[in-house]
C-alpha cells in the first residue's frame, strides 16, 4: 500500500554501510514527518541518492520536506503514452551519450509544478494537450548530498532501453562522485 512505513527507515542508523541509496518506492500516503526526516537526514548529511519514477510522489507531509530532497514537486502524471525527452544539458556528464532526444516507448509523463533552486534540469518532455515542458531528468543538491532523479521508468519497456540504462548508470556514478 502507499501507506507503508518501510521498517528499515525506522532505525535512526538505517543508512550505515550504504554507499548510495536507490529510492523507487511509492509511499504517498506516509505523512509522518519524523519518519520522513529519518529517511532524508542521511542524504542531507552526504549519502548519495538515485530517485526513480514514483519516488517523486512519496511522503506527502503537507509541506516541502520530501520535495526539497527530490528537488522538484510533482502532483501526479497524465495518461500513459510514449513521449520524447529533450536533452537540455548535452555537456553534463550524465547526459553525454544520451543524444539530443530519447523516446520513452511507454510511460507516464509526470507533471512538474515546482523546481527548487538547488535543482538542475537535464531533460524535459512536452506534455500532451498543452505542450508545456515537464522536467523528467535532473540533479539536486541536498545539504551535503548529491541526488540524481528521473520520473521516467514506469514500464519495463522503457527501463530496458540501453539509452535509459546508460543515463541511470551515469546518474548513479555522478551522485557518488
What are the language-model segments listed below?
Residues 1, 19-24, 43, 48-53, ...:
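Structural recognition of the beta-strand scaffold that forms the well-ordered cores
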Residues 14, 34-35, 62, 134, ...:
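Residues at alpha-helix caps and immediate loop-helix transition turns in enzyme cores, especially N-
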Residues 129-134, 141-177:
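Extracellular ligand-binding/catalytic regions of CAZymes and related secreted enzymes
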